[in-house]
């Protein structure tokens, strides 16, 4: 949510920031609503003052036995009372209209975010690792000999439809090992607190984390009104909704491994083969709650936490800074980490690490008490994938594939796989 005071103070800067995202100016329409709302509030306050004055004079007239003045003042009190109610109702309606308009407007990009239209304008920050040099044409994950029988799309389609998969046997175990490895690394090495969170959330949690109203069509809602989370960013971030935190308690660093659900409403025809884009998938999420002056450093810390997972797995990747046209709705700045997929001969997103500034905090009224004793301020919230488990599985399988259809697995997973380090061409761990 945007700070209406900032828009009042510098509407040109607000419109310029929207223009960087390719949006039309909106300050004039917003401020017209704001002015009308404030006028109604002032009218209600003035009418209330007049009502209070008349109420006091009613008593005086009654005590003096002045019935004519008493009746006149009593009628005035009723008139002002009705006017107060009318003005307050009008102000409430205008406030709701203003809030609705603001809730559809994307976050303001940070100054260092590159301007651009789409992913072609993103800026590469760094690369890590050597791309594997195969003496054969590498296959996509679902075509690899040891994988094909354990990645069952047909049975999943029979039970659930398109964009679902049933992982079986050794591949299911590798998938589970990856999620455990990620959580253990974040808790034991990165100092995050593990949370086992709900995956069903209320409207307030979706709104507070900027998923409503913008992304209603991309999400699944149950018949009794709960929403299935598209990311555990939602329940993790919303843990501080309505709170006033002590500065000494910050930063708060959380992680969770959950199922996630997305309708992929805008992805028709994209990545239809394999398990790269699914309606149901698993992800390990990181969330940080910080003081404003710490959020930029915290974003870099979270980025390194995500990159470290890939480095421990030995998976080549590149990190890119997203341009204004490719950045998500709630983000002020986003870094994407893209893992190398030999089967596609391309880097594909495996993590996004974003800072939202106080955009989400304003929506959910999450604040902290500064150490100097000043008035409560809004916290900053950050989120990042650490990592998308299914996409990490794809990267492990494609980068480790061998000519005979087997897959050499990252050594760091051996402890989760009973000491086994290879997925055989027959689909067993050896």
Curated annotation (Swiss-Prot):
Compartments, record wording: Cytoplasm
PROSITE patterns in alphabetical order: AA_TRNA_LIGASE_II (PS50862)
Coiled-coil intervals: none
UniProt xrefs under Pfam families: Seryl_tRNA_N, tRNA-synt_2b
EC numbers on record: 6.1.1.11
Broad class of enzyme this protein falls into: ligase
UniProt keyword terms in alphabetical order: Aminoacyl-tRNA synthetase, ATP-binding, Cytoplasm, Ligase, Nucleotide-binding, Protein biosynthesis
Pathway listed: Aminoacyl-tRNA biosynthesis; selenocysteinyl-tRNA(Sec) biosynthesis; L-seryl-tRNA(Sec) from L-serine and tRNA(Sec): step 1/1
Catalytic activity: tRNA(Ser) + L-serine + ATP = L-seryl-tRNA(Ser) + AMP + diphosphate + H(+); tRNA(Sec) + L-serine + ATP = L-seryl-tRNA(Sec) + AMP + diphosphate + H(+)
Residues engaged in binding L-serine: 231-233, 285, 385
Gene Ontology annotations for the cellular component aspect, listed alphabetically: cytoplasm
Binding partners and assembly: Homodimer. The tRNA molecule binds across the dimer.
HAMAP family linked to this entry: Ser_tRNA_synth_type1 (MF_00176)
Function noted in UniProt: Catalyzes the attachment of serine to tRNA(Ser). Is also able to aminoacylate tRNA(Sec) with serine, to form the misacylated tRNA L-seryl-tRNA(Sec), which will be further converted into selenocysteinyl-tRNA(Sec).
Name of the protein described by the UniProt record: Serine--tRNA ligase
Record organism: Roseobacter denitrificans (strain ATCC 33942 / OCh 114) (Erythrobacter sp. (strain OCh 114))
Lineage, opening ranks: Bacteria, Pseudomonadati, Pseudomonadota, Alphaproteobacteria, Rhodobacterales
């Amino acid at each position: 949510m945007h700070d209406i005071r900032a828009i009042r103070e510098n509407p040109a800067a607000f419109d310029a920031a929207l223009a960087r995202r390719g949006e039309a100016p909106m300050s004039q329409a917003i401020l017209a609503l704001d002015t009308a709302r404030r006028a109604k509030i002032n009218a209600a306050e003035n009418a209330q003052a007049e009502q209070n004055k008349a109420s006091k004079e009613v008593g005086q007239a009654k005590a003096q036995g002045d019935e004519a003045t008493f009746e006149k003042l009593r009628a005035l009190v009723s008139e002002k009372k009705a006017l107060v109610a009318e003005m307050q109702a009008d102000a409430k309606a205008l406030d709701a209209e203003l809030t609705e308009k603001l809730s559809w407007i994307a976050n303001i990009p940070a100054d260092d975010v590159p301007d651009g239209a789409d992913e072609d304008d993103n800026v590469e920050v760094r690369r890590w690792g050597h791309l594997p040099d195969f003496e054969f044409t590498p296959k996509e994950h679902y075509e690899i000999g040891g994988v094909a029988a354990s990645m069952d799309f047909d049975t999943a389609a029979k039970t659930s439809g398109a964009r679902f998969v049933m992982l079986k046997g050794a591949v299911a175990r590798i998938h589970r090992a990856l999620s455990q490895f990620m959580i253990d690394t974040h808790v034991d090495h990165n100092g995050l607190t593990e949370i086992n969170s709900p995956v069903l959330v209320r409207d307030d949690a979706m709104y507070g984390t900027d998923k409503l109203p913008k992304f209603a069509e991309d999400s699944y809602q149950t018949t009794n009104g709960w929403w299935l989370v598209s990311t555990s960013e939602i329940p993790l971030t919303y843990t501080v909704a309505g709170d006033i935190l002590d500065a000494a308690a910050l930063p708060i660093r959380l992680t969770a491994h959950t199922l996630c659900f997305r309708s992929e409403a805008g992805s028709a025809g994209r990545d239809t083969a394999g398990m790269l884009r699914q309606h149901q998938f698993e992800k390990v999420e990181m969330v940080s709650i910080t003081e404003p002056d710490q959020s930029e450093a915290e974003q870099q810390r979270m980025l390194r936490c995500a990159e470290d997972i890939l480095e421990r797995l030995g998976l080549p990747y590149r990190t890119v800074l997203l341009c204004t046209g490719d950045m998500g709705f709630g983000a002020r700045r986003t870094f994407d980490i893209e893992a190398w997929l030999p089967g596609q001969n391309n880097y594909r997103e495996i993590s996004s690490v974003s800072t939202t500034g106080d955009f989400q905090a304003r929506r959910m009224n999450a604040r902290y008490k500064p150490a100097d004793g000043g008035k409560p301020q809004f916290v900053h919230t950050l989120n990042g994938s650490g990592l998308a488990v299914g996409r990490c599985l794809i990267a492990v399988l494609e980068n480790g594939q061998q000519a005979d259809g087997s897959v050499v697995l990252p050594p760091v997973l051996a402890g989760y796989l009973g000491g086994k380090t290879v997925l055989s061409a027959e689909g067993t761990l050896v």
